[in-house]
């Protein structure tokens, strides 16, 4: 994966991820959400999924830090929540939603110091 530089790179990267996860990998993404929901009440069985999620969060936080965003933890949490919302929206309600405006607005708002 190429290095993500600056807010524009973060926007492009997030858009590409949502497009991929709701396009070519849509079946896998739906299955992952089904598993998350089904295993939410079972700490032991759900641990492998939660571990993968934590690894994804750590990777996202590393990108946020590399982009130069101060206070990376809440920014990472917000980006992850936005990503989840956009993924679910595209998979269930509006598969053709133009995600770029929402991602741009969020990233620009989160990168203001």
Residue ranges of predicted features:
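Amphipathic alpha-helical segments within well-ordered protein domains
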Residues: 15-18, 36-37, 61, 65
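Generic structural signal for hydrophobic core residues of well-folded globular domains
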Residues: 21, 39-40, 86, 90-91
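Hydrophobic alpha-helical connector segments
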Residues: 1-29, 76-79
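Hydrophobic/aromatic-rich alpha-helical bundle segments in the mid-to-C-terminal region
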Residues: 45-50, 54, 65-113
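Amphipathic alpha-helical segments used for helix-helix packing
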Residues: 12, 23-46
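Short amphipathic alpha-helical interaction/hinge segments
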Residues: 1, 29, 60, 87-94
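Short, solvent-exposed amphipathic helices
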Residues: 27, 31, 48-55, 59-62
């Amino acid at each position: 994966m190429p290095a993500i530089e600056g807010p524009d790179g973060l926007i492009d990267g997030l858009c590409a991820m949502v497009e991929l996860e709701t396009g070519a990998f849509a079946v896998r993404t739906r299955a992952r959400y089904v598993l998350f929901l089904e295993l939410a009440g079972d700490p032991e069985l759900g641990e492998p999924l939660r571990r993968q999620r934590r690894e994804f969060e750590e990777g996202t936080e590393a990108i946020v830090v590399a982009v130069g965003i101060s206070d990376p933890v809440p920014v990472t949490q917000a980006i992850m929540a936005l990503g989840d919302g956009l993924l679910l929206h595209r998979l269930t309600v509006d598969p053709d939603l133009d995600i770029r405006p929402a991602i741009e607005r969020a990233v620009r708002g989160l990168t203001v110091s």
